[in-house]
Amino acid sequence: MELCFNEMTVMKNGTLPEDIALCAQAGFSAVELRKGTLLRYLRGGGTLEALRQTLEEQHVRAASLNALESVSFQTKAGGRMLRELSEWCFAACRVLGCGCMEVIASFNVPEGISAAAICREAADSLLRLSDAAADYGVRLALEFMVMPGSSVRTFAQCAEILEAV
C-alpha cells in the first residue's frame, strides 16, 4: 500500500514545494497535485523541471493531477479550450513523471438529458481525451462529484461510463 497525500486538503496554506517537503516528512510517498496550485506555482516563477527535481529530492511521486473539469457536454469553443488545456496538462504530467490525470464530467447538463445520454456523452468525451493522453503516457481517472448539478454523482455511474468506454 502507498500513502498518497491529497493536496486539496492544504491548497491555500503553503507553496507547492513546501507541500511536497511536508508530504515526505509525514511519510507520504505520493501526492495528488492540484491543477490550480500547480498553475499558481508556475505563475510565481516556478518551473515544471524544478518541481520534478523537488519531487525526486523528496522521494515523493506525483500520483495524479487533479483535474480537467467539465469534460462532457462542451460547446465548440469550450471543446477547443478543453483540448488546449488538456494538452498542456498531459505535457506537464509527462515532465513531472505523473502518469494519471483526473477528469470530471460536466456540471452543465442540458435540461431533460437522460442518464443513458449522460453516460454516452461522458464515455465519448473520455475516449477523445484518452487518445491525446496516451500520446503523453498519461492515463485518465474519472472522478465522480457528489455535488448539486454534477452529471456523474456515484461510483455506479462511473463504472457504467467506464464499461461503455
Residue ranges and their predicted role:
Residues 1-3, 60-63:
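Transmembrane beta-strand segments of Gram-negative outer membrane beta-barrel proteins
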Residues 1-15:
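Boundary/entry segment of secreted carbohydrate-active catalytic domains
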Residues 5, 23, 31, 55, ...:
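Conserved, mostly hydrophobic/aromatic
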Residues 17-36, 96-97:
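Catalytic domains of carbohydrate-active enzymes, especially glycoside hydrolases
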Residues 32-56, 105-114:
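Glycine-rich, proline-tolerant flexible connector loops at the mouths of alpha/beta enzymes
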